[in-house]
């Protein structure tokens, strides 16, 4: 009887831990490495190890330059991630809109960039923002859309999806048109997907779900973000957004934290726990 009670006690203690492990196995959640940029500069290998131990399953890089990722070759970066149970899903990088004279050199830059990402095993390359030309006239924004279509075609040839990440300025009007709508209407869905930042669209005064209804299947990646750690501000109502994930075309969710109540590593761990515990995150 005593032995039976002891076994039951072990089972009761173990069950919650098993549930947590099961959640981590079932939910695939990525981390934007910009969230831990200082840690990556100090100790990339140690930081990646900690992120894998937290339960993140993939990363979005923010450290590409000159054919390398955080100073590592594409193969070395991929090996580091895989050794820690992580995959390389996406990367923030990009090049400003070139003038006609700079077009060929810019396309060569993209060729090197795309090749490096293909060698590292990335699925997505995301341009994180535009320079001031993109926030000027609709004529300049149209040039950006044409540019993105050209880059997206190059990415497609290497089996990579190209996309654009918003801040709040994309939801301002120019010449009677909301910039973000103009971009969605003037980019080819086969060449350009959109990474919707859920916090910045809220700051821009728009509803994510309204965009899902109007432009279904265009939002393959999401930045799940709050003012600080996820759930901290009380301003973000994530549940109705996640309920429209299929309509949006969402394939992967990525945590990003840029302002912190704790150390960056603790902040991203708390944010991961928030999503792990959220029943609407599948």
Model regions and ranges:
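Active-site acidic/histidine proton-transfer and metal-coordination neighborhood
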Residues: 58, 99-193, 265
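Solvent-exposed, polar/charged alpha-helical surfaces in well-ordered, non-transmembrane soluble domains
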Residues: 49, 53, 75, 79, ...
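Positively charged n-region of N-terminal signal peptides that target proteins for export
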Residues: 1-5
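Bacterial N-terminal signal peptides
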Residues: 7-16
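N-terminal pre-domain/capping segments
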Residues: 7, 21-123, 217, 273, ...
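Acidic-and-aromatic substrate-binding clefts and catalytic sites of carbohydrate-active enzymes
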Residues: 36-42, 62-73, 95-107, 132-136, ...
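Histidine-acidic metal/acid-base catalytic patches
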Residues: 23-33, 40-54, 121, 175-196, ...
């Amino acid at each position: 009887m005593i032995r039976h009670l002891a076994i039951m006690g072990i089972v009761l203690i173990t069950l919650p831990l098993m549930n947590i492990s099961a959640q981590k196995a079932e939910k695939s959640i990525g981390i934007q490495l910009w969230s831990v940029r200082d840690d990556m500069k100090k100790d990339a290998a140690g930081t990646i190890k900690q992120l894998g131990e937290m339960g993140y399953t993939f990363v979005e890089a923010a450290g590409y330059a000159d054919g390398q990722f955080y100073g590592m070759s594409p193969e070395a970066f991929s090996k580091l991630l895989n050794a820690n149970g992580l995959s390389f899903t996406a990367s923030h990088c990009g090049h400003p809109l070139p003038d006609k004279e700079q077009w060929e050199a810019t396309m060569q830059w993209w060729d090197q960039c795309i090749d490096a990402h293909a060698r590292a095993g990335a699925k997505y390359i995301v341009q994180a923002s535009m320079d001031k030309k993109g926030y000027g006239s609709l004529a300049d924004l149209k040039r950006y859309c044409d540019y993105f279509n050209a880059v997206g075609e190059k990415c497609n040839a290497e089996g990579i999806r190209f996309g654009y990440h918003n801040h709040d300025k994309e939801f301002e009007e120019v010449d009677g048109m909301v910039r973000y709508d103009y971009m969605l209407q003037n980019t080819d869905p086969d060449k350009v997907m959109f990474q919707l930042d859920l916090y910045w669209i809220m700051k821009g005064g728009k509803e994510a779900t309204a965009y899902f209804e109007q432009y279904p299947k265009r939002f393959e990646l999401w930045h799940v973000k709050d003012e600080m750690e996820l759930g901290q501000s009380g301003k973000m109502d994530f549940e109705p957004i996640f309920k429209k994930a299929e309509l949006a075309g969402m394939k992967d969710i990525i945590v990003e934290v840029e302002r912190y109540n704790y150390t960056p590593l603790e902040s991203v761990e708390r944010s991961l726990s928030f999503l792990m515990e959220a029943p609407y995150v599948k």
